[in-house]
Amino acid sequence: MKNGNISAENKHALEFLFPINGDVVNERDGVSSENGIILTVKLIGKPDGEVYVNNIKAANKNGRFTANVPVSFYRSVLVANDIKNGETTEITVFYFSGAVKKFRLSSDDNILFLKDITVNKDKYSSIFDNPYLAVYKKAHDLYGAKVHLNLFYEVDKEAASKFNPSPEGFNLSMTTDKFRNEFIKNSDWLKLAFHSKSEFPDKPYLHGTAKEITADYIAVNREIMRFAGKECISDSTTTHWGAANRECVRALRSLGYRSLTGYFEKYGDEFIVSYYMSDKMCEHIGERDFYYDLSEDMIFGRIDLVLNERSYGEMFEKLKKIVSHPHRGGFVSIMIHEQYFYPSYVNHLPDFEKRVLTACEYLYKNGYSGAHITEVSEEKHLKDNPLFKKKHTGLKTT
């Protein structure tokens, strides 16, 4: 038996073209039904084949097969059987029923706002007296944004050199715990997570070890627990540069992370912020909201737009295209980097706040509501289909 993963077209092997093994689907991928969605499943096989998918006969156009198959459960197995040629293949797909018309705002490379809160702990009466966090509070209060901040453990020398004055010397262990209760109070919409030890070196986990990433995670997570409470900790993150080999991803999964986000987008000659994924898989994930890598039990989410990468006008035009995209516009993930907020940073963006608020406003006015990845990827009321706890033959029954 063969699993339905992306491969070169083979007219003599029964293979799923859409969805593929590990695909996450939602209402944008099919037609809504009373109990879920109807997917138009596409396969390739022998031209003379007679194929059934979960007991539903597929139409055959010279070896290209389509079948309208209901998907109603969080996890479903699709079994295709060519009863004429004796070929069978199956895939597992996931249905995130609450992942349409949702958006997420995240930020990477965070640490400096915590230094400011610590330095001003006797002056500030709230964490939102910090100007940087105040931007996200506005995004939440005005547009319902749910915000996710990925943290460095320390400000390294090279990163500090890009600021004037330099913020070198600060690490999370210095963060005040005075505002712990306020972090907890706002933890329904404001989440914190491990990013990496520091900004440099780049891509620390691309060739890293489980021991290294675990040590860095422990250092960051211990301090988040201390100054913000376990309620603020997210089970999703983006590792620094979205680069991590399988060993490091396995370590993160064992530590409790359920999802990782990245670009899965080509810059020049290579895909970046794409973890260990092959170019072929990056091409696929880059056109989806989510993908579930069953081999590592890890969900991968597509970051749709990095707010600090383009001019304001280009950013806004790209956001419009994403919203209208048939397979990326269900759950829209927007992201920015903390350092661009500060006038002391060499690449400061004076319109940082405008970019964040305008993007959130546009999504809100187009019917989107804020959500954390955990909220849309949890099984909740959707249970594994009991029909698939036993081997499904894929044969039509009478």
Enumerate the language-model features and the residues they cover:
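Surface-exposed, short loops/turns at beta-strand junctions within beta-sandwich domains
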Residues: 68-75
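Metal-dependent polysaccharide deacetylase catalytic core of the NodB/CE4 family, i.e.
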Residues: 146-245, 267-271, 334-341
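Active-site-adjacent pocket scaffolds in enzyme catalytic domains
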Residues: 116, 159-174, 178, 231-232, ...
